[in-house]
Structure formats: C-alpha cells, structure tokens
C-alpha cells in the first residue's frame, strides 16, 4: 500500500477577480519530513499557491490534502493545527513582546483564547531556548533586528506544532550568516516529521539545504525533484531568462552564478 503524502495539491487554479490567472492547474505531492524549496521569478505564483494551501486565499478550483484529508472541508482552527505560516512581510506586532508573539502559535489549541496553560508556557519557553531567543523574551518584537525577528516568527510557527510549515522568503534582507542560521533552524524542524515548504529567491541556498525543489514559471509548475537533478543551466535560462553557470563546489554543493561571476579554476566542476 502506497504511503499517503503529507501534502497533495491537485489541479490547483487561482484566478483573481481582475482575471489574473496566478496558479494554473498545479499538481504535486510531498512526503513527510522534507525541506522543500519553492523557487521562481517574482510573480510566478509561489506566494499565491502557499496562501491557497493554508486557505488565506480560496482556490478557484482544485483540492489540497494534508495527510489525505482535504483542507477545503476544514475550519480555520483545524487548518491552523495542520499548517503554520511564516510570511515574507512582518505584520504589525502591536507592541507584543517576543514571548507573547510566540505564544500566539499556541492559540489554535487553547480552550479559552486568553487562558494559556502551564504546559503552553513551558512549550513556549523551551521553543525560545531552542531558537536562541530566550534572552529576548521580554523585548518588544519591533525592537529586534531583522534576523532576530525572523527567528521569533519561525519559533511561533514551530510552537504551533503543525504538519506543514509554509515559509515565504525567510532570508530576504539578511546577511549570509543569518541566512545560514535560518536554514539550519528550518532543517531542524524535520526532526518533528513535519514538512517545510520555503519560497525563496536564493537558488544556491535552496539547492544546498533542500531535499526537493519545486520550480515555477508564470503560474505553472515547471519541475520538481532533487535539486542536483532539476537545477540546470537550461532550466535557469528557461525560467529566469538569464545565462548562469551551475556547478558543484569542493563539498559537492550546487552553486548558481551569473556567467561573468562563474569561477574558472578546478575547485569547481559542472555536474
């Protein structure tokens, strides 16, 4: 008997009221315990698809299943227990502290919205420590650096205990150290047997950390598979309409560079 995918998207279409067809008949499935990169140019439908998966946007047609159950029949509270979200744009914090912000991730489980249990508080404290922001728990979220805010928002999504985490452009505006830190934290999620779907523009970063990559162009799914197999110079040319060199570094990790930046020594080799 075939294993049920953690996430299955069936013939997803999203057409906005102005007639714009953002996602076009998209179908794919993802197993549990995978870090999955979602890449493609601006406007290719990545964010729209993720918003349809968590029902922030209603699909025009198609179905989305988590562990074999359609989210189309789920209430918002039920979906919040299955899917957590780390948005690209930081929403207003309304003066909340780091602790209060992360506690919001527990609200789908509370019997009374404002009555957190000792168990909830312990879970939040443990999560703050896990993500290295425990010392910031009493600080206002809007007083943190971009990297610290990103860790807090990932911690909030983690404490929600979802099956699927959707992360939209988590490394934007971060330096390389924070980018690598964020990706390490996302990989750590996989120990909970959840799947993490990350929309990102840094192709090399996705190729280095992700188990699978989904590539989109103009609302359509172009390819899905192992990064070392699907990320090629031909694909970059077709999807991004630029010339790039795709190769392997001395550690066997993929790099993607514009042609004029490509290294010219034997440390690198084309796959």
Language-model features and meaning:
Residues 54:
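Helix-to-loop junction immediately C-terminal to a conserved catalytic motif
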């Amino acid at each position: 008997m075939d294993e049920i995918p953690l996430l299955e998207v069936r013939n997803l279409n999203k057409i906005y009221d102005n007639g714009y067809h953002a996602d076009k008949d998209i179908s794919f499935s993802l197993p549990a315990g995978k870090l999955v990169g979602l890449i493609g140019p601006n406007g290719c439908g990545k964010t729209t698809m993720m918003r349809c998966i968590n029902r922030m946007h209603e699909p025009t047609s198609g179905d989305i299943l988590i562990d074999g159950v359609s989210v189309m029949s789920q209430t918002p509270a039920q979906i919040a227990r299955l899917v957590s979200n780390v948005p690209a744009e930081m929403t207003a914090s309304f003066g909340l502290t780091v602790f209060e912000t992360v506690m919001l991730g527990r609200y789908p489980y509370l019997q009374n919205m404002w009555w957190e249990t000792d168990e909830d508080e312990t879970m939040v404290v443990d999560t703050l420590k896990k993500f290295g922001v425990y010392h910031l728990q009493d600080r206002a979220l809007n007083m943190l650096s971009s990297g610290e805010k990103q860790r807090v928002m990932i911690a909030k999504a983690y404490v929600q205990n979802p099956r699927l985490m959707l992360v939209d452009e988590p490394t934007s505006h971060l330096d390389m150290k924070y980018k690598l830190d964020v990706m390490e934290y996302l990989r750590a999620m996989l120990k909970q047997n959840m799947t993490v779907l990350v929309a990102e523009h840094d192709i090399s970063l996705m190729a280095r950390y992700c188990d699978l990559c989904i590539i989109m162009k103009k609302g359509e799914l172009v390819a899905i598979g192992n990064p070392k197999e699907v990320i090629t110079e031909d694909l970059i040319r077709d999807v991004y309409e630029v010339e790039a060199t795709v190769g392997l570094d001395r550690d066997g990790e993929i790099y993607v560079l514009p042609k004029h930046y490509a290294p010219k020594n034997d440390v690198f080799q084309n796959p």
